[in-house]
Design a protein with these regions (language model features):
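Residue-level preference for the first positions of well-ordered beta-strands
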Residues: 123-127, 154, 182, 214
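Walker A/P-loop nucleotide-binding motif
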Residues: 121-140
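A short, basic N-terminal segment
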Residues: 1-106, 259-272
C-alpha cells in the first residue's frame, strides 16, 4: 500500500503547476494571471480530496499549437521523403508553378494539378507533345511537385532511366511504378528500340492502364506519328497512351535555345 501511496505522491508532485508572475490564489486554487483560468483543480481520491495541477486555458492553447506545429513538421518531412523517393533529379524537385512563366500551356497544366483528385478518380492523364525544348518536361514536373505538395505520391522518370535501373524483372518495375498515384514518363520515343525495351515500355504503360492510375507523358513525337508509327511494333503502346492521356500541344518557345543565347550574351559581355 505504501508503494502505491509513494507512486501517487510522485504523480502529484510532478503535476504541481509552476507559479509565474501575475498568478494568484482564488478559492484555495492557483489561477493563471494571463487567462484567469485555474492552474489547479480538486480531485477526490478515495476518501481524500487532493489538489492537483491542471492546464490553464493559455497553456492548453500553447500545447495545441505545439502539437499542430509538430504535426506540420512531420508532414513536411513526409512530403520531402516522397519527393526524394519519386524525383531522382534534385533540380526537377524545384520545378514549380510559382517559378513558371505564365503561359497558356502552364495555365492548362495548373488546372490539371488543381483538379488532380478528379483526374485520379477518373484515371485521366496528359500527353504533352511538341518540339524539343519548349517546356514539356518542366510543366509535367510542376504538376508532379504540386501533387507531392499535397502529400500524394508522384514519380517523375523516363524510359531510359527505367531501362538502366537494374531491375530484376518487368514485374518489379510495374510494382514500383504503381506505388505512385501519379506517374510522369518523360520523353517517350527516346528509349532504345529493341525487344526488351519495347516489351518494358508496353508493360509499364499497360500496367498503369490496368491500375486505373493517371499517367503524364511528354514526347517530341507528333500525334500523327503516335497514331501511325513507322515501327508498327509501337502501335499498341501508342494506342494505349492516346486512350489514357489527353493530348496537350506545347507551342512554346524553345527555352533551351533562348538560354543558350543568354549564356552567349553573358560570355560576350565578359570578353569586352
Amino acid at each position: 500500500m505504501s508503494d502505491i501511496s509513494d507512486a501517487l505522491a510522485g504523480v502529484i508532485r510532478r503535476a504541481e503547476p509552476v507559479r509565474e508572475s501575475g498568478d494568484y490564489i482564488q478559492d484555495g486554487l492557483l489561477y493563471c494571471g494571463h487567462c484567469r483560468t485555474p492552474k489547479q483543480c480538486r480531485i477526490k481520491l478515495g476518501d481524500a480530496v487532493r489538489v492537483l495541477g491542471c492546464q490553464c486555458a493559455c497553456a492548453e492553447r500553447r500545447r495545441e499549437a505545439e502539437k499542430k506545429a509538430e504535426a506540420e513538421r512531420q508532414e513536411r518531412m513526409r512530403i520531402e521523403e516522397l519527393r526524394v523517393s519519386g524525383i531522382a533529379d534534385k533540380a526537377v524537385r524545384g520545378y514549380t508553378f510559382e517559378s513558371a512563366e505564365d503561359t497558356p500551356d502552364i495555365r492548362k497544366c495548373r488546372v490539371y494539378a488543381d483538379h488532380f483528385d478528379d483526374a485520379l478518380n477518373a484515371g485521366k492523364g496528359l500527353l504533352l507533345w511538341g518540339n524539343t525544348g519548349n517546356g514539356k518536361t518542366f510543366a509535367a514536373s510542376c504538376i508532379a511537385n504540386a501533387v507531392l505538395d499535397r502529400g500524394i505520391p508522384a514519380m517523375v522518370t523516363s524510359f531510359p532511366r527505367i531501362l538502366s535501373g537494374g531491375w530484376k524483372d518487368r514485374e518489379q518495375i510495374a510494382q514500383q511504378m504503381n506505388r505512385y498515384k501519379l506517374l510522369v514518363l518523360d520523353d517517350l520515343g527516346a528509349e532504345r528500340q529493341n525487344d526488351f525495351a519495347l516489351e518494358t515500355v508496353y508493360m509499364v504503360i499497360d500496367e498503369r492502364y490496368k491500375s486505373g492510375l493517371p499517367l503524364i507523358i511528354t514526347t517530341n513525337l507528333t500525334l500523327d506519328e503516335l497514331a501511325k508509327p513507322k515501327n508498327m511494333d509501337y502501335q499498341r503502346i501508342y494506342d494505349r497512351v492516346l486512350e489514357m492521356c489527353t493530348p496537350l500541344f506545347f507551342a512554346g518557345k524553345n527555352r533551351r535555345r533562348e538560354q543558350a543565347n543568354e549564356n552567349l550574351k553573358w560570355l560576350k559581355e565578359l570578353m569586352k
